[in-house]
Amino acid sequence: MIEISDSKYSRFELINWWKQEILSDAHILVVGGGALGNEIVKNLAMTGAGHIYVTDMDNVELSNLTRSVLFRKSDLGEPKAKTICRRAKEINEDISVKYFDQPVQRLGLGV
């Protein structure tokens, strides 16, 4: 029988190649805060990705609510990237999230 720890990420220990410390130390840039960006950030937060950066220049619109899991009606008019980061932190307070509301080309290599 396999022993599983009490860690938040204990179920991942069942995957023999999984290395939580690598994901926890990772710096990941998500370009775009639409439906796909929402899902990616949600999953990264839930799995404990250490440092998530999100860039998007748009604001949350009504049409986003039916396809973007991290947006709520109360977020209408707010920057998508900022809202996504706030929700990711609600999902997992142990991660670091930072947003940019500018084109990815302007971020440079020092993100």
What are these regions (language model features)?
Residues 1-111:
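Adenine nucleotide-associated cytosolic modules
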